[in-house]
């Protein structure tokens, strides 16, 4: 069998669903052709391969390219001052009601043109590349008007076309209310105009919403999701972050790819998510920055068999964190995830949360050849340490990226 590239003499953590745990293979090899994995497994069992290029990994660890399944990477302005305000005792809600929070970023983002949006996000993404991330989700939601939201999604698509990352674009029009419109008019714009136009233009892979008292209620989100499903788009949800508002159950009702945050999600809502196949995306960065006390019910997620992913939630206000490795470590320390759960949470389960479960997130024949090659003796070192990543090489679609 011919292949373009062959990585041999490696230790693999395949994260493949047909292998137990992290799917560890000692003395492993991976072969790719036309950007896809054609074989992965023990080198001793490798079929006869004729490789155009062979890379001796010298015993290094290879994992799937990491997947960050929840980010707000396109934005304007700076909200670092809100950190000091919260330290002084102001709440997230009070800052938002006084024109800070999402609306502050909205004003700054509306002032950017599409080129500036793309340039800012690409500069930030250098930190993700340095950590072996190959797939990233990018949301809109900081424009809250037609022109800016479309520009954000076009910028996200342009970043994906540039080839350094696989980008899943998500329309988050129902993030908060823009100040210049009333609720009925804005929801009508989102549901009747924006979602159909975005779907027709292929600008988004999914539609997200923020289901909280300070944003949108369950009935309003249901209308947004109905419009998304009618347009053929998947749905995701910011759910039960600040209070139990039935977000997890709502996500399950619409067969959402994921529900994210979930600090206040009920055990019943989590069980409904598991039955619906929705992934629970844990966002410990926001929990940390907001100094929350309520943790997601990880025990209920385990008991229900609900897959767990971990993401940065990178945004300029409540999770200004540019490290998926740190987020995974936080999920272990703050939320009690195991080492295995954390790794699956930033690989296979994160891909599932984007509807990309058959495409990336595991080293498995037929998937895209997205790899992270680590200069470590043990995978423990990748998540145990905070700071520069011990990354040797990052591969996207079979090519060094």
Curated annotation (Swiss-Prot):
4-imidazolone-5-propanoate binds at residues 79, 142, 175, 241, 318. Pathway: Amino-acid degradation; L-histidine degradation into L-glutamate; N-formimidoyl-L-glutamate from L-histidine: step 3/3. Its main location: cytoplasm. GO terms for biological process: L-histidine catabolic process to glutamate and formamide; L-histidine catabolic process to glutamate and formate. The keyword Protein biosynthesis does not apply. GO terms for molecular function: imidazolonepropionase activity; iron ion binding; zinc ion binding. Binds 1 zinc or iron ion per subunit. Catalyzes the hydrolytic cleavage of the carbon-nitrogen bond in imidazolone-5-propanoate to yield N-formimidoyl-L-glutamate. It is the third step in the universal histidine degradation pathway. This is Imidazolonepropionase. It comes from Acidiphilium cryptum (strain JF-5). The lineage of its organism: Bacteria, Pseudomonadati, Pseudomonadota, Alphaproteobacteria, Acetobacterales.
């Amino acid at each position: 069998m011919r292949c373009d590239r062959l990585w041999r003499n490696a230790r693999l953590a395949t994260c493949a669903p047909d292998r137990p745990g992290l799917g560890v293979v000692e003395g492993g090899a991976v072969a790719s052709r036309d950007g896809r994995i054609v074989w992965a497994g023990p080198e001793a069992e490798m079929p006869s391969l004729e490789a155009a290029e062979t890379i001796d990994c010298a015993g290094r660890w290879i994992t799937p390219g990491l997947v960050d399944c929840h980010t707000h990477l396109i934005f304007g302005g700076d909200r670092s001052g809100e950190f000091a305000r919260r330290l002084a005792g102001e709440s997230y809600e009070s800052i938002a009601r006084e024109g800070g929070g999402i609306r502050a970023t909205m004003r700054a983002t509306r002032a950017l043109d599409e080129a500036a949006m793309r340039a800012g996000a690409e500069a930030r993404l250098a930190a993700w590349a340095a950590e072996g991330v190959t797939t990233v989700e990018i949301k809109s939601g900081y424009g809250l008007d037609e022109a800016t939201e479309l520009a954000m999604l076009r910028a996200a698509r342009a970043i994906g076309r540039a080839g350094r990352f696989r980008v899943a674009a998500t329309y988050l029009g129902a993030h908060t209310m823009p100040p210049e419109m009333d609720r009925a008019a804005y929801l009508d714009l989102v549901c009747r105009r924006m979602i159909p136009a975005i779907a027709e233009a292929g600008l988004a892979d999914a539609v997200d919403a923020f289901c909280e008292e300070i944003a949108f209620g369950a009935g309003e989100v249901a209308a947004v999701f109905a419009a998304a499903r009618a347009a053929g788009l998947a749905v995701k949800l910011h759910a039960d972050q600040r209070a139990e508002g039935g977000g997890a159950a709502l996500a399950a009702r619409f067969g959402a790819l994921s529900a994210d945050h979930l600090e206040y999600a009920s055990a019943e809502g989590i069980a409904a998510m598991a039955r619906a196949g929705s992934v629970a995306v844990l966002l410990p960065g926001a929990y940390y920055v907001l100094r929350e006390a309520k943790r997601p019910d990880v025990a209920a997620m385990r008991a229900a068999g609900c897959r767990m992913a971990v993401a940065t939630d990178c945004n300029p206000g409540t999770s200004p964190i540019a490290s998926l490795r740190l987020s995974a470590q936080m999920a272990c320390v703050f939320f009690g995830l195991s080492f295995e759960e954390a790794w699956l949470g930033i690989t296979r389960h994160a891909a599932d949360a984007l509807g990309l479960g058959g495409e990336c997130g595991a080293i498995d024949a037929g998937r895209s050849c997205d790899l992270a090659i680590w200069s470590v003796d043990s995978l423990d070192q990748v998540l145990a340490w905070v700071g520069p990543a011990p990354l040797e090489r990052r591969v996207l679609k079979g090519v060094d990226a």
